[in-house]
Amino acid sequence: MIEEFTHTNAQERVREDMASAITALDFLATSIGRLAALHEADEEDAIITEGRVIAAKREMVKAVTGLLEAE
């Protein structure tokens, strides 16, 4: 059966995709933190990179929030 494409379906798919992206960014930030602990010499760079990942996550959350508020 073919699923009818509606505005509501599209919004739900966007929400699901954004949630998946946020989950992936969380995992990436955690992984970078763990790598930093293993390689203390590179810890400063890892912390900077982890901060960038967290900033990207914040932007993703803002985008999702904006989409939800626009409904």
Segments predicted by a language model, with ranges:
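N-terminal acidic leader/helix
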Residues: 2-36
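Short, charge-rich amphipathic interface segments used for partner binding and complex assembly
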Residues: 23-71
